[in-house]
Amino acid sequence: MVSDAGTPAISDPGFLLVRACVEAGLEVTCLPGPTAFVPALVASGFPCDRFVYEGFLPHKKGRQTKWLSYKEEERTIVLYESPHRIVKALEECVNFLGADREVCVAREISKLFEQFVRGRAEDVLKHFQQTPPKGEIVLLVKGI
């Protein structure tokens, strides 16, 4: 299985194919490849020894519940988000986790326009309200 959008089976249904191969008794080998969240996590400056990878937040149902579950999370939270929903995600972060919660938005990892915006959730929100982002985004939230 090969993907032109990061490591197969990370935030996509590729695991179904892997599971079917395993169940059929086929050998599965994985070569390390590009996954945006690993370099984003390392370069965020947040603790990397314990983190939780959540992938994409639900679009509607269960979204608020997810945010509320992060309120007491001690580990660094790693999320994928689309450029047209990052402002909404940051607004929710401010509302549910607090304006002072530290976040890092990593954008276009390993590409020409790679960018890291770090700081208080409220300040990072203001940045992206004024400058709408483009490209692939990883949102990292520091644990408590």
What is each residue range found by the language model?
Residues 2-4, 50, 104-108:
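Short beta-strands and strand-loop turn motifs
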Residues 11-15, 64, 87-90, 118:
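Conserved strand-to-helix beginnings and helix N-cap segments that scaffold or border functional pockets
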Residues 12, 16-73:
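Class I SAM-dependent methyltransferase SAM-binding "motif I" and its flanking Rossmann-like core
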